[in-house]
């Protein structure tokens, strides 16, 4: 009897909550208050007129899609199982995620009136990861999330010509960091096992694996 099956599912993940930081209007008021007390008017050069929520810019709702197909069947003396699955997972940080393809093939054959049993199990996988520059992944630019929390909310994401806006400060444009720092990995794996089981006598067998 042969069987064919297919399954799929979709799920979403998102940030549970954001960290409270000053919005553009409150940031300007706070800098004005500081200036009235210190006389430091440099904040006027740092007010770029935008109202950017940097956490909204770098976080998203990540969608995960998974698809699987399998076929199995056989007879009294032989059987097989083949399966193939694909997963595409978006991270909750922009430009991060994982996609994975996995295939498996299992074969079994009984010979000589079940005195000899041959089995083969094969598994192959391809995994691609794209990492967001969080933690040390940000390199000299620092941590992406830390930059998003420190970033000036009056700073726009893009300048007038469509390039990423970057002022002359120690805080990097978080969206630029997420897009320009490319941290990827690819893993390919293949596992194979072949076994032969020989029934020497009732209750006595010898199995060899390769």
Show where each model-derived region lies.
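Short, P/G- and charge-enriched loop/turn segments at secondary-structure junctions
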Residues: 54-58
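Fold-independent oxyanion-binding glycine-rich loops
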Residues: 9, 84-85
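A conserved hydrophobic secondary-structure block that centers on an alpha-helix together
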Residues: 76-77, 93, 97-98, 104-107, ...
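Surface-exposed loop/interface segments of Gram-negative outer-membrane beta-barrel transport/assembly proteins
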Residues: 3-51, 92-94, 102-189, 207-210
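Outer-membrane beta-barrel transmembrane strands
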Residues: 60-78, 85-87, 174-210
């Amino acid at each position: 009897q042969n069987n064919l099956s297919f399954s799929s599912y979709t799920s979403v993940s998102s940030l549970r909550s954001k960290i409270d930081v000053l919005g553009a209007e409150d940031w300007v008021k706070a800098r004005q208050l500081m200036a009235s007390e210190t006389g430091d008017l440099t904040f006027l050069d740092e007010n770029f007129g935008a109202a950017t929520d940097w956490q909204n810019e770098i976080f998203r709702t990540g969608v995960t899609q998974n698809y699987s197909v399998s076929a199995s069947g056989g007879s009294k003396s032989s059987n097989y199982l083949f399966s193939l699955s694909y997963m595409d997972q978006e991270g909750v940080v922009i430009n991060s995620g994982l996609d994975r393809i996995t295939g498996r093939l299992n074969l079994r054959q009984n010979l000589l009136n079940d005195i000899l049993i041959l089995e083969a199990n094969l598994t192959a996988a391809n995994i691609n990861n794209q990492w967001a520059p969080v933690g040390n992944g940000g390199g000299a630019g620092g941590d992406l999330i830390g930059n998003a929390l420190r970033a000036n909310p009056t700073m726009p994401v893009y300048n007038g010509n469509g390039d990423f806006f970057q002022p002359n400060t120690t805080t990097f444009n978080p969206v630029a960091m997420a897009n320009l720092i490319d941290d990827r990995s690819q893993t390919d794996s293949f596992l194979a096992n072949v076994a032969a089981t020989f029934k020497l006598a009732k209750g006595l067998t010898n199995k060899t694996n390769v």
